[in-house]
């Protein structure tokens, strides 16, 4: 399956199969507001048991956020599962290295739902199930250099499901594999930098996006990436 990632800047057409759960955000079993991020150590698993976590009223403010603004920080190889990220947050989940998210839901995205960075070529991050609502910009921001796999995810009212960093200070090739995703009322499913050799593979994706895969001319720091076209294949 992942061998398809070798096809640079490619969109693989496939029969539509809406596999993202369309029943809405699960009902939380409990709610917790924390004054600081929860850190999950390298290689460890945090099962939230369907509780809701946020950062408290007023946490969603304008501008880019950092680790201090996240609800969860996952160290390399950590897993977060069965959790709802509430609307009172600036940043949702930060992965410092490859990570796994299983059935992680975002009620109302403020800046970015998921940021992946610190991963290297050959590393794989997995986002399995779950979903996100009301992401005015990006759901998944990828700043590292590995592969992000998004499987059976649901997105509604969003800017982009996945974006390869357009202006990180240090740039590299990034890969994304997206399968079984359902995405409505939004923009790109994936935005990738063609000049850095990024790849996007879409398989069994159900969406009303006009252009599911968009190509950009990325740049390194202090600049604005330019949209240059659409994927073909």
From Swiss-Prot:
Signal peptide location: 1-17
Keyword Lyase: yes
Predominant localisation class: secreted
Keywords in alphabetical order: Calcium, Carbohydrate metabolism, Cell wall biogenesis/degradation, Glycoprotein, Lyase, Polysaccharide degradation, Secreted, Signal
GO BP annotation list: cell wall organization; pectin catabolic process
EC number: 4.2.2.2
Known catalytic reactions: Eliminative cleavage of (1->4)-alpha-D-galacturonan to give oligosaccharides with 4-deoxy-alpha-D-galact-4-enuronosyl groups at their non-reducing ends
Molecular function terms, GO-annotated: pectate lyase activity
SUPFAM superfamilies: Pectin lyase-like (SSF51126)
Source organism superkingdom: Eukaryota
Cofactor binding mode and count: Binds 1 Ca(2+) ion per subunit.
Localization, UniProt: Secreted
Family named by the database record: Belongs to the polysaccharide lyase 3 family.
Record function comment: Pectinolytic enzyme consist of four classes of enzymes: pectin lyase, polygalacturonase, pectin methylesterase and rhamnogalacturonase. Among pectinolytic enzymes, pectin lyase is the most important in depolymerization of pectin, since it cleaves internal glycosidic bonds of highly methylated pectins. Favors pectate, the anion, over pectin, the methyl ester.
UniProt name for this protein: Probable pectate lyase F
Organism: Emericella nidulans (strain FGSC A4 / ATCC 38163 / CBS 112.46 / NRRL 194 / M139)
Gene responsible for this protein: plyF
């Amino acid at each position: 399956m992942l061998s398809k990632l070798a096809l640079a800047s490619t969109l693989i057409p496939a029969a539509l199969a809406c596999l993202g759960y369309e029943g809405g955000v699960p009902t939380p079993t409990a709610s917790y507001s924390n004054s600081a991020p929860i850190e999950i150590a390298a290689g460890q698993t945090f099962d939230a048991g369907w509780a809701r976590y946020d950062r408290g009223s007023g946490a969603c403010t304008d501008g880019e956020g950092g680790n201090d603004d996240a609800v969860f920080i996952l160290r390399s190889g950590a897993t977060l599962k069965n959790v709802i990220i509430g609307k009172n947050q600036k940043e949702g989940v930060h992965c410092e290295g490859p990570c796994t998210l299983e059935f992680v839901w975002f009620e109302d995205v403020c800046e970015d739902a998921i940021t992946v960075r610190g991963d290297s070529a050959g590393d794989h991050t997995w986002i399995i199930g779950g979903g996100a609502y009301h992401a005015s910009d990006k759901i998944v921001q990828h700043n590292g250099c590995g592969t992000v796999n998004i499987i059976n995810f649901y997105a509604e009212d969003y800017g982009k499901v996945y974006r390869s960093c357009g202006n990180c200070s240090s740039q590299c090739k990034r890969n994304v594999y997206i399968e079984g995703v359902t995405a409505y009322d939004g923009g790109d499913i994936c935005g990738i930098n063609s000049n850095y050799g990024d790849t996007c593979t879409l398989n069994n994706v159900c969406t009303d996006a006009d252009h599911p895969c968009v190509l950009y001319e990325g740049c390194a720091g202090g600049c604005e990436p330019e949209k240059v076209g659409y994927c073909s294949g």
